[in-house]
């Protein structure tokens, strides 16, 4: 799953945490 998340949002690599990074990115973009 981590591979899919990183593939969808490369920016996640900056955070270093695909799981948490995905949630944060989703909130920031939808927020």
Curated annotation (Swiss-Prot):
Q: Which GO terms describe its molecular function?
A: toxin activity
The propeptide segment or segments lie at 1-10, 19-31
Q: Which UniProt keywords apply?
A: Toxin
Q: Which domain of life is it from?
A: Eukaryota
PTM: Processed by the macrocyclase-peptidase enzyme POPB to yield a toxic cyclic octapeptide. POPB first removes 10 residues from the N-terminus. Conformational trapping of the remaining peptide forces the enzyme to release this intermediate rather than proceed to macrocyclization. The enzyme rebinds the remaining peptide in a different conformation and catalyzes macrocyclization of the N-terminal 8 residues.
Q: Where is this cross-link: Cyclopeptide (Cys-Pro)?
A: 11-18
Tell me the function of this protein. Probable toxin that belongs to the MSDIN-like toxin family responsible for a large number of food poisoning cases and deaths.
Task: Give the family from UniProt.
Answer: Belongs to the MSDIN fungal toxin family.
- Full protein name: MSDIN-like toxin proprotein 8
Organism listed in the record? Amanita bisporigera
């Amino acid at each position: 799953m981590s591979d899919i998340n990183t593939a969808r949002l490369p920016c996640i690599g900056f955070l270093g945490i695909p799981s948490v990074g995905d949630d944060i990115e989703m909130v920031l973009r939808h927020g």
